[in-house]
């Protein structure tokens, strides 16, 4: 009888411990799923703000990296490297951090603005850029990645040269940037 009572008590303790461990594991899973859902909602909010700013033509593209002539990307200072679009007026400046050059601010205008979405949900914007310092217009393609404000920009010049730029999109007026000396021609 004592053995039976001892066996039942042991089984009861082990089963209650297993139930508590299972409940604790389920709580951890629920917390992990809630964190994932919150992170996904935050990413979607950032993407929605960036895509709305691009469609409204009022955005600031903070440049992180620029592809230089030999094909490698070089980092830039994203507080002073940017492309700004306000309706049809643009301002652009790239600061590679070189001690030999200071950032120059270049103004321009755009035309033929087109916006579309691909199969993955990425926003693709195309337009023609005419800067005041260049006689040739440049075709610009911007691809905003879904659920992010990360954007890839490709600038195609008339002579066939392409420049690839990576950065982030933020609504105009939400970030403070350094503006260099305007280039006047």
Report residues per predicted region:
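Bacterial Sec-dependent N-terminal signal peptides
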Residues: 1-27
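N-terminal post-signal-peptidase region of extra-cytosolic proteins
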Residues: 45, 63-78
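Short hydrophobic/aromatic-rich beta-strand segments that constitute the beta-sheet cores
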Residues: 61, 89-93, 151-155
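Mid-length scaffold segments of soluble, non-membrane domains
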Residues: 75-128, 132-135
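Surface-exposed, interaction-prone regions used to assemble/regulate multi-protein complexes
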Residues: 53-64, 176, 181-184
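Solvent-exposed coil/turn segments that connect beta secondary-structure elements
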Residues: 66, 86-88, 94-96, 147, ...
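Sec-dependent signal peptide cleavage junction
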Residues: 17-60
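Helix-rich interaction surfaces within compact, conserved domain-sized segments
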Residues: 115-185
